[in-house]
Amino acid sequence: MGGYPGAPISHLLDVLADANESLLKPLGIYYELSGSEAAAAALLGASINYPVRGAVTWKSVVGTNVASDALSHVASAGVLGGALVVIGEDYGEGASILQERTHSSALKSSIPLLDPRNTLQSFARFVEEGFGLSEACNEPVFFSIRIRACHMRGTLACRDNVRPAISMRSPLQAPSFSLERINLPPFTYAMEAKKFEQRLPAARRYILERGLNEHRPGTEAHLGIVMQGGLWNTTVRGLHLLGLADLQGRTPVPLMILNAIHPLVPEELLGFLRGKKRVLVVEEGMPNHLERELKALAHEAKLDVEIGGKEFFSPHGEYVPALVVGGLRKFLVSANPTAQSVTAIEDRYAALTAHREVVRAALPEPVSKRPPSFCTGCPERPVFSAMKILRTQDPSVGDTHVAADIGCHTFSTQAPFNVGNSVLGYGMGLASSSAVAPLFNKRVISVMGDGGFWHNGLTNGVANAMYNRQDSVLVILDNFYTSATGQHHNPSTGTNARKEPTGMTIPQALRGVGVSWIRTVDSYDIPKMIGTLRDALTTRAKGLKVVIARGECQLERQRRLRPLQRTRVAAGETVVQPRFGVDPDVCTGDHSCMRLNGCPSLTLRESPDPLREDPIAHVDDTCVGCGVCGEVAHAAVLCPSFYQVRVIANPGRWTRLVDRLRRAVIGALAPA
């Protein structure tokens, strides 16, 4: 088992890591947090020659794109053991990346795709069915789980674990070799024939015999709704709101729930379509593969049925309840001949619309737009503050093209920094600047995180730049974790997901591919960062210049420190925590500090001076004491309104005495 983390499925790898010692190892199951999706997909190669089951996971189409080389080879050669790919379908309102469908990837490589109903019990069943389907058709199988389903909570009934016949505890004794499983001509031609003559027909038989898709008959026999299994909850909820379904999903409208959306089973779908006049396809995203296939099947079978889909909903975007209810209403009103039914549906829809208007009127103002931002104390923020200060103070040097990358640091493209002219993929920032760099009259900057560096950046970025003698600057943000996915381990962490030491560092890797100009800077030292960036951009030395900005992810740091601090405070030990503030009598309300910082803990409050109308800066209680606000004010030569205090828990006698003396002196010098 393995995979690469990415929302919305990252926590699955956390669960596997937590279960490694207590469950996986005793069963002889191997687990790894892979270096990339391609490495994870290659794990499934074990199932090509041996009856070994394997499961991997990653994020959406972007993960599948990275994995596609290895995955296409596995799908071509075929598998003996069940091979399951669990994909977090990152599509819609909560998505963090490209809006594309796994369905297209499944069609490209002839990989069966499961999209089951979004219930925990259904997921448990279809994991088992997924392995069975894979072994029945000798192909890997995609198992798609949507964003909201990835965050469900609940209970389910499980069955006992079955110890695998081949495992780390029952190892193989001899290798298996067959030229027919090597992806080389002429065997690739035979593999292609097997896909369509044997494997996909076997998949259809399994889907039909095991009843993976669900047909729910209804009294309105002339109508029908075909949907992806993952949209069952939303569709039935929409029917319920229109008065056409109860809370258990019983409805007079016949339903076909496609838990397996590729390959489709023609006889199953034709059996549903026969005798119907109007059928609606509820399919999220484009291209509308299901709608097209259904129309083609009906046309070839010469069925007199009108099939609709996207014209009732939207050609793009997530099918949220409001959109689905509206689409169902349009379809049912146009398809139902009885005036009584139409009136009832329209009345329910009008009541829903009126309720939304009441809610909208209850909100005095629209919810404020809040762009994504760095966390409080994030070590990546000061790096972009330094870039912005350099660009402002010395535009002839600092005002240059910046190739951004995937990660937390992508937020640099947002206000207040607006640093980053392009984002092309994970670890691809440096490679994306290869064509831009020769066209500029100054050096360009590329940015990547340590996660992106180890994933793709070292080979496709750094090695490519060295090979092509690129003269530019690379900034690597080394925060010791793949933080954007949830602080997962990478080689910079020092240990892997199994807590084993790695012995890998970014400087070692850079020197290994020939980089000689390497500078390491504390992320929070803004003046030094500005100076180092200026040196990298102006030095006469040709070739790639790398600036490594080191600073631990603040979220992970606080998770580690706060329990220790609470324990020490409870034990009566003295604990000192730095905090920063803004002197309200000094701050003029200029807000330059915010325009160069953007810290969530740095906010606004009313000025105590009645002659100053503008609100002043204020540091709230979420401050973690990183000091970036003061560093920015100093480096940018801003106002001197920032101050640092120390919050002391369980102060000793000497500390209390000094505090009393200070208060006495201050009171004498500045009487009330």
Which stretches of residues belong to each language-model region?
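Short acidic, glycine/serine/threonine-rich loops at helix termini
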Residues: 11-15, 43-46, 66-70, 93-101, ...
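Flexible, low-complexity linker and terminal segments
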Residues: 117-380, 523, 534, 541, ...
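A glycine-rich helix N-cap at a beta->alpha junction
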Residues: 21-33, 76-88, 167-175, 467-480, ...
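Intrinsic disorder at enzyme termini
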Residues: 571-583, 635-672
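Conserved thiamine diphosphate
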Residues: 90-140, 146, 172-187, 361-362, ...
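Short helix-loop-beta junction
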Residues: 15-23, 109, 238-254, 508-514
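Thiamine diphosphate
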Residues: 1-120, 148, 218-221, 226, 413-545, 556-559, ...
